[in-house]
Each structure stands twice: as structure tokens, then as C-alpha cells.
């Protein structure tokens, strides 16, 4: 990805996932109204436009999209009529990772939509033929039998890796093993090779379902609070990737899937606090879709003790400023969610740290 000239050595990476509501059009006539743009329970167009404008105001060098860019199943027409309307102006800077809503069927809340297996996602980001067939290579990585959109790129002194964790899909033969030679195992081997050959000082990796959750009060209080991928089959990949990144001294992991903002303490692969060698995790799933609820204890503390700070009342994008050997983060709300508290827009989280390399 071409980088614009800079007068200094800092770069801006905007990061967010879980963004665009399903448009209310003829193709989605059977979808319940509560799941489409215009539903009062969703952020809808107002939220996705607010977060897009917030990201644009950051003047980013790149935009890390953390999956579930388009609900409910990410058809190409959905991308064109919803995501594109708000986020299209940043398209050439967007470096996406897919989410479950781009691959899997959606059969909840009275809906029954066929999974797209990544077709709409790749067609939107990589371009497509006149017949709508996605191009095999492009901005979202390769769309082939041997590679389903994992890739890496450099921004300044930073190496950034985008991964596809949607292994419980036809594209991956519904195979979430990282060791059996299947497609996910090949992706995991690619990650190991990519990290071994990296010569940049600092590394960020991102994918959709998080390794460590802030949403599930049961899993958050286990001795190992890792129930990766929010108790899903994708957890095998999340665990394996965290081990590789930890061994390679990666600096940050970014995820979406859980619809709020949460920052975690540096952790080892078992979910233990590790201030010396651990990797901080940021969940930034506050791009526009209906917000989730953080898991808390009776005293108001977070159920997962590794959560430092979090908010589930507003939509927003995280700004990462990448320096040569350090970084800073800044998260500010862009729009309050439905039924938000009076203090929702006063939340903020910012800080800085050195990169691990």
C-alpha cells in the first residue's frame, strides 16, 4: 500500500469493526425490520456515518477494519447500499479483515439468510466481474482455494497482519484445526513464516473474534479467561495465533465481534497478566451495529480482571499513532447509542507505550 510522504516518523492507523446495518431494500424484504437500517435498537446509518466521519477526521494513513463490516450476511448489494454510503470515501485506505457476518448464515431473531462465504466481501473490496464474481486478488487479499484473505503490510516501522478466522465456513471446509493441513492450518503456518521473516521493529495483528472476552461473565471468571472467539470454534485459531504472536514479541492485537470498546492488560497465551512480555488486546467493535453489554460483577468491576477500561454506551473508532518504536492510542465516542447514559459521550481512553520487537 503506497504511503504518503511524512514530515516525521509517525503514522495514523484508524481501527474499528462491526459497522454497517442491513439496508431496507427488496432483497432484504424478508428480514425482520428490527435487524435493518431504521430500527431504533441499532445505530443504523447515523452511527456508521458518525464513525466514518470520525475516522476521516483522523487523516489516517490506513484503516484497519476488524470484521463484520456489513450486516447481516454481507451481500455485495448490502455493501453497496449501506457500508459504501458511509465508509466509501475511505475505501482506498481500508485494510479489512472479514467477520462471521461476511461468511456465515444468519438464522437468529426471526431471520433466515444464506451465508455468503465471503463472496460479497471480496467483490466489494477487491472488485468484481460484470457478472459479480469477485476478483481473485486485491485490497482484501487473495480469494482463492489456497488463501482466504490473509495478508500483511508495513506502515512506517510497523508490520501489520490481517487474518481470517472464519474457519467454520465452506471456504475452510468447516475445519478449525490449526494443525491438520487444512486451510486454517495453512493460514497458521503462513502467519508463523510471515512473523519469522518480518524485519520491522513493531507488529500489530488483527482478526475478528477476540481471543479474550469481556462479554461473557462465565468465561471471564474461569482460571483461564481465554474462551476464545466468544465460546466458538474459532477459538482454536485465536489461541494458536496468540502463541505465535507472543513468541514473536508482537506489540498489539486488535479485534471486533463484541460490540463495544475494551482495552485489556498485556497477557500471555493463557490469559495471565504479563506486564513484561504480554500483548495488550483492544476490542473495537463499536463501528455502528447494535451495542453489546459488558460483563460486570455486582460491585461494578469487570468480570474479566484483565479488562482495564471499557464502554458499551456509544459508537466510536480508535486512533493509533504509530511512532518508530512506540505508539499511542486514543478512543473517543462519536455518537451515543440508543438509551445511553447521560455520561456516554464523556468517556475517553488514551495512553502510550513502547513497542515490543
Locate the predicted segments by residue.
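Generic beta-strand structural signal
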Residues: 15, 65, 154-155, 322-324
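Active-site charged/polar residues at nucleotide-handling catalytic sites that mediate phosphoryl
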Residues: 58-59, 198, 248
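N-terminal active-site segment of His-dependent metallophosphoesterases
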Residues: 1-77
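Histidine-centered catalytic micro-motifs
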Residues: 205-212, 251-261
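A short C-terminal boundary segment appended to hydrolase-like catalytic domains
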Residues: 301-357
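Active-site glycine-centered loops adjacent to acidic/histidine catalytic or metal-binding residues
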Residues: 18, 67-68, 99-100, 163, ...
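Extended active-site neighborhood of metal-dependent phosphoesterases/phosphodiesterases
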Residues: 26-39, 72-199, 203, 217-235, ...
